[in-house]
Amino acid sequence: MIAAFIKRHAPQRRLSLWLALPVVALLALVMMPALFRHDSALQIRASRQGASLPDGFYVYQTLSAQGIHIKSITPEQNSLVIRFDSQEQSYAAERVLRELLAQDFDIAHHHNQSATGWINRISFKPQSIG
């Protein structure tokens, strides 16, 4: 009786396996860019209490005048985060901003963990990708 049931439903299981396999492969393909994206960014913070952040438009104009393309500038947790298309542009912008802003501000590379953060939230052990 059990053998007859298994034999009768075997083609349906094979079909569902062949349907599930492309769905999983497509899902993995769609998730790859999000998992391995390296967002190049700088974060500017005031080095002393009471100092205000530089104007984002002023920073944009200064970096654009130097030929540095900026993807976005956003305020984020008492800092200014500037995103770039490439690591080279980020390093060039860091040099320009260190001269421009002198010692009033801390300039550091900003590592965005949002792409892999969801993996760390569902896992017992933190993951490091890349």
From Swiss-Prot:
Keyword Magnesium recorded: no
Gene Ontology molecular function: any one: protein kinase binding
Residues on Cytoplasmic side: 1-15
Residues in the Periplasmic compartment per record: 37-130
Protein's cellular compartments: Cell inner membrane
Gene3D superfamilies, per the entry: 3.30.70.260
InterPro entries: Modulator_MzrA, SecD-TM
Membrane topology designation: Single-pass membrane protein
Keyword annotations of the record: Cell inner membrane, Cell membrane, Membrane, Transmembrane, Transmembrane helix
Signal peptide (UniProt feature, chain positions): none
Transmembrane parts of this sequence: 16-36
One Gene Ontology cellular component: plasma membrane
Function: Modulates the activity of the EnvZ/OmpR two-component regulatory system, probably by directly modulating EnvZ enzymatic activity and increasing stability of phosphorylated OmpR.
Subunit comment: Interacts with EnvZ.
Family note: Belongs to the MzrA family.
HAMAP family: Modulator_MzrA
Protein name (record): Modulator protein MzrA
Organism of derivation: Erwinia tasmaniensis (strain DSM 17950 / CFBP 7177 / CIP 109463 / NCPPB 4357 / Et1/99)
Gene encoding the protein: mzrA
